[in-house]
Amino acid sequence: MSVKRLIITAVAAEADAVASGLDGAQPHPQGSANVRHTATADILVAGVGSAAAAAATAAALARRHYSLVICTGIAGGIGIAGIGDIVVADAVHPADLGAMSPDGFIPLEHLGIATTANAIDPPVVEELTGPLRYAGLAPVIGGILTVNTVTGTDAHADDLRRRYPGAVAEAMEGYGVAVAATRAGVRYGELRVVSNRVGRRDRRAWDIPGALRRLEHAFAALGAAWCNDGSGQAAAREIDGGCP
């Protein structure tokens, strides 16, 4: 049975950074620009947003078995997470899935409609953070929010911090990936690199190139661990060149 991981990104630049970190990315045999193969993971460009991410993840999991699904890319930092920080989710929250009221936002749980709680299994958190710590990359652990509209005002950022005091980042795909993986019975996690602080939209303060470089470094550390734990060597036989 394969032990490969499935890595989901929103855009190609994120997938390229991940593939560079893992080393040895191979072109898809059908020539798809949306898939990159490495010895230990398949990297899929799903598109922007939770719906696109859920659909792409579900389709990929229907085609083959993966041991772990990781949603990754760049993100806005909240709370203690600063620009350039690598953040790993201990929970995924759909921060705008619910209803508005005169008293503010009401999540689905409080409406009695559904549950949106998606805590990450602690062993998955450790699987992602352990190699990062070993490489000296000091990950920040906390909740990662999934939104359909990214935050662009300080007032909304303050509201998110109030509602999710343990949150460290905001992105757009994690909840969709979590739902698809959970329904397929596959473990999942989310890892991001902060490119900007959540709040008033100021592109001059963003560092997307730096965040992508840090994303590459993060997956270089993960790839080394995956190759060295034995399971990576088994997966390596599926790809010419294998693990370094």
From Swiss-Prot:
CDD domains: futalosine_nucleosidase_MqnB (cd17766). Its EC number is 3.2.2.26. Signal peptide: none annotated. GO terms for cellular component: cytosol. It catalyses: futalosine + H2O = dehypoxanthine futalosine + hypoxanthine. GO terms for biological process: L-methionine salvage from S-adenosylmethionine; menaquinone biosynthetic process; nucleoside metabolic process. InterPro entries: FL_hydrolase_MqnB, Nucleoside_phosphorylase_d, Nucleoside_phosphorylase_sf. HAMAP family: MqnB (MF_00991). Catalyzes the hydrolysis of futalosine (FL) to dehypoxanthine futalosine (DHFL) and hypoxanthine, a step in the biosynthesis of menaquinone (MK, vitamin K2). Cannot directly use aminodeoxyfutalosine (AFL) as a substrate. This is Futalosine hydrolase. It comes from Acidothermus cellulolyticus (strain ATCC 43068 / DSM 8971 / 11B).
